[in-house]
Design a protein with these regions (language model features):
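Immunoglobulin-superfamily
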Residues: 2-6, 10-119
Length: 119
């Protein structure tokens, strides 16, 4: 008795297509009111987009860098602008800009600081 074996080899071809997507920012509120002399944070989060994503913050069109009382925390899909003690002079138009190799997005808010006045 002879045994015949049929060996069938199946090869599967998998094609993985990576589609890069530009970042899409979760929009900031148009206007934010904050009391003076409080700590405050402004968060910029990504709804979708291919990593790595580069974040930048701007105040009135000028890039913000870490400075005394203001710091920037960067994560893979978000960035937080921290104010240790927010003052009236921090009022202005703030923008978060997110970019990757496929494009960019930005969102802006007007930050209004309520000061205490002594008469």
């Amino acid at each position: 008795m002879s045994l015949n074996y049929l060996l069938i080899l199946c090869f599967y071809s998998v094609i993985l297509e990576i589609i890069a997507r530009k970042p899409e920012i979760d929009s900031l509120k148009p206007i934010i009111n904050v009391e003076q002399n409080e700590s405050f944070q402004l968060m910029c989060g990504i709804l979708k987009g291919t990593k790595p994503i580069k974040f930048e913050w701007f105040k009135n069109g000028r890039k913000i860098v870490d400075q005394s009382g203001i710091s920037i925390d960067l994560k893979p899909t978000s960035s937080i602008l921290f104010f240790d003690n927010i003052l009236v002079q921090h009022s202005g138009n703030y923008s978060c800009h997110a970019s990757n190799s496929d494009g960019s997005d930005q969102s802006s808010t007007i930050l209004q600081i309520k000061g205490s006045f002594l008469f």
